[in-house]
Amino acid sequence: KEGVRTVILGKPNAGKSSLLNVLLGEDRAIVTDIAGTTRDVLEEHLNLKGISLNIMDTAGIRDTEDVVEKIGVDRAKEYADKADLILYVIDASRPLDENDAEILHLIKGKRAIILLNKSDLDMQVTKEQEELPEEFPVIEISAKNVQGIEELEDTLKEMFFQGELTFND
């Protein structure tokens, strides 16, 4: 299917699957409190404010001894490499760590939007965080409470109509 190839990246339990469900308006991805619930790439097609997206939910990125989870992590990185756009979901209720550093390295030089999720909780990561590269828009969201999603959609629309996002067939 045609659309902006959009990959949701982040550590385990950051809220990637919850974000996908919110954007789709239905519970497509399994959401639990168990880190590593998503093992494989879940791909969905969605029309967001007139923009066609092929959106992919991926396994949380972390060092893991679990063989199956590791394949999912490697696959997430491969998909990120081919993405037109990366939605990097950060659990803002926890401080950034070396896994975040790895993801920030992965998205360098790509089109990305950084989403500080769980803004309904006590935030440990803010927009002013020096580790966050200035080249990317940073939006506070709460996937659980559907906050900040409108701002995300508007940012996507803006990027698209400014020609920053292109389609891949």
Q: What is the predicted role of each segment?
A:
Residues 69-93, 142:
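Inter-motif core of Ras-like GTPase G domains
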Residues 57:
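Conserved active-site aspartate in kinases
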Residues 1-52, 64-66, 96-169:
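C-terminal-of-GTPase-core extension/linker across diverse P-loop GTPases
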Residues 35, 61, 69-73:
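Short alpha-helix of the ABC ATPase nucleotide-binding domain corresponding to the H-loop/switch region
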